[in-house]
């Protein structure tokens, strides 16, 4: 598989405080990569660099290189709207917009300039099916998306991200606010979808990372400690500190 996103020597500072210390990490296409590590290690900060979600934070400075399909995403010619269409995001707290399920899914399509009602209808249905939420919503497309359960709302958010046909979806702890049953349903959905999309997921749940990811990156204190196939890292980590973290000795 080819690398769809590459990062080289990425540093990020908030004012005089450096949060990322030169991370170099590549992501293979149509694989699910988990970013793990203790709270405050830089997982979410790094994830948000990959589609420039950190841009509006005051006094932030980012250096190094991040490329999406060999294009420098921090270059002067990068179109942010296009980047975020290709590299979508699902947040920790389910965040559907306060309007109907249909309009939530259609939102990104309309922003992208799609006006064909038939095409929008088709994409709405396809995306809700991909996110395994069609059965619960097909007779309630006009219902406010915020009226559904937390797990259903998160799958609606995943469907909204998929509707614009991104190539990569960033997931920032997508199940941490959900109950175990809803979390399991999201995991099953991701296992189905990872054959068609590239996923990069921050998770505190090591069992979740071992169950559904193909590759794992372990970060600590703003440094990349270890990266490799998930099965290899969990069975035979290369570094003692990785073994200590995976075995619950800290974190």
From Swiss-Prot:
Superkingdom, taxonomy of origin: Bacteria
Oligomeric and partner information: The complex is composed of two ATP-binding proteins (PstB), two transmembrane proteins (PstC and PstA) and a solute-binding protein (PstS).
Domain spans labelled ABC transporter: 5-246
Cystine pairs: none
InterPro entries per the UniProt record, alphabetical: AAA+_ATPase, ABC_transporter-like_ATP-bd, ABC_transporter-like_CS, P-loop_NTPase, PstB-like
Residues annotated for ATP binding in this entry: 37-44
Name this polypeptide is given: Phosphate import ATP-binding protein PstB 2
Gene Ontology BP annotations: phosphate ion transmembrane transport
Family: Belongs to the ABC transporter superfamily. Phosphate importer (TC 3.A.1.7) family.
Any one GO cellular component localisation term in the record: plasma membrane
Organism for this UniProt entry: Lactobacillus johnsonii (strain CNCM I-12250 / La1 / NCC 533)
Keyword line: ATP-binding, Cell membrane, Membrane, Nucleotide-binding, Phosphate transport, Translocase, Transport
E.C. number: 7.3.2.1
């Amino acid at each position: 598989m080819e690398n769809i996103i590459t990062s080289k020597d990425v540093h990020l500072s908030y004012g005089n405080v450096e949060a990322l210390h030169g991370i170099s990490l590549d992501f293979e296409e149509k694989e699910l990569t988990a970013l793990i590590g203790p709270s405050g290690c830089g997982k979410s900060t790094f994830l948000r660099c990959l589609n420039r979600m950190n841009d509006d934070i005051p006094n932030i400075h980012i250096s190094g290189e991040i490329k999406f399909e060999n294009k420098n995403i921090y270059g002067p010619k990068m179109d942010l709207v296009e980047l975020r269409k290709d590299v979508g995001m699902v947040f920790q707290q389910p965040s559907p917009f306060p309007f109907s399920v249909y309009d939530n899914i259609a939102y990104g399509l309309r922003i992208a300039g799609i006006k064909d009602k038939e095409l929008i209808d088709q994409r709405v249905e396809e995306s809700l099916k991909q996110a395994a939420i069609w059965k619960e919503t097909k007779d309630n497309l006009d219902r406010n998306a915020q009226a559904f359960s937390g797990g259903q709302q998160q799958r609606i958010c995943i469907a909204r991200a998929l509707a614009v046909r991104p190539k990569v979806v960033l997931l920032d702890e997508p199940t941490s606010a959900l109950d175990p049953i809803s979390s399991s349903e999201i995991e099953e959905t991701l296992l189905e979808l990872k054959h068609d999309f590239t996923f990069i997921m921050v998770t505190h749940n090591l069992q979740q990372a071992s169950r559904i990811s193909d590759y794992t990156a372990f970060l600590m204190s703003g440094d990349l400690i270890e990266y490799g196939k998930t099965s290899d890292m969990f069975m035979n980590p290369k570094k003692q500190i990785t073994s200590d973290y995976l075995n619950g000795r800290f974190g």
